Swiss-Prot record:
Native species: Archaeoglobus fulgidus (strain ATCC 49558 / DSM 4304 / JCM 9628 / NBRC 100126 / VC-16)
UniProt name for this protein: Putative ABC transporter ATP-binding protein AF_1841
Residues annotated for ATP binding in this entry: 41-48
Domain of life: Archaea
Chain segments annotated as coiled-coil in the UniProt record: none
Length: 238
């Protein structure tokens, strides 16, 4: 999907859940530096599973995932994961620190940023997402839209090279959705977004992978996929 450095490669990847149900089947794709890829499909097509596989958070049942040319193992897992930011569909799966400020600083503290660097970053991203007034509040007391903004801010703050997003605009109001999309449009790294919202996919991506309800790739290509109603209907998207 490009001429630059290959960032993520999936080679005939399948994943089965412990109960035997299929996550994805025989998925192969290549994502290059600077790519903006939309994983589109109906609910249950395997988009979320594929995001977790591409992030190295699940291990394939079959096939291989390579990130920056390497399979993840105990020796390189921390190094690789610091280059990748993952935004989960449900912020409650991610937010666990006592305050919003602590959420924003969780990774910077692990990376041993200076106090000045951390304070400057908190100020920048809190203002960017409109959450300055929430910095001292516990995340569990926030609304769904506020939680989503905190989650995305806490990933972007450490400037990952690759951003993997699972339904980043789900369950938010129109104003919050527009803010999130504007910020993600400005992200300069490699971006992969899983979504069933075609307008979101079209706004953030220029290359697309369509997953069908058999958990396989139905098609891959450019924005012409979004205009092919027959193909989208076959995959259960419309």
């Amino acid at each position: 999907m490009g001429d630059n450095l290959k960032v993520i490669e999936a080679d005939s990847v399948s994943y089965d859940y412990p109960d035997g149900s299929a996550g994805v089947r025989e998925v192969s794709l290549e994502i290059f530096e600077g790519d903006r890829v939309g994983l589109i499909g109906a609910n249950g097509s395997g988009k979320s599973t594929l995001i977790l596989l591409l992030a190295g958070l699940l291990r394939p049942t079959k096939g291989k995932i390579r990130i920056f040319g390497r399979e993840i193992d105990k020796k390189n897992v921390e190094e690789i994961r610091r280059k990748i930011g993952v935004v989960f569909q449900n912020p409650d799966d991610f937010l666990f620190n006592p305050t919003v400020r602590d959420e924003l600083l969780y990774v910077p503290r692990q990376l041993e940023w200076s106090e000045e660097e951390m304070e400057n970053a908190v100020k920048e991203y809190a203002e960017m997402f409109g959450i300055t007034h929430l910095l001292n509040k516990p995340p569990f007391r926030l609304s769904g839209g506020e939680k989503k903004k905190v989650e995305i801010a806490s990933v972007l703050i450490y400037k990952p090279e690759v951003l993997l997003l699972d339904e980043p605009t789900a369950y938010v109001d129109g104003k919050t959705k527009r803010l999130i999309l504007k910020i993600l449009e400005d992200f300069k790294g490699t971006l992969v977004i899983a979504t069933h919202e075609l307008d979101v996919a079209e706004k953030l991506a220029d290359k697309f992978v369509l997953l069908n309800l058999e958990h396989r790739i139905e098609a891959a290509g450019g924005k012409e996929i979004l205009k092919n109603e027959e193909l989208l209907e076959k995959a259960g998207v419309i």
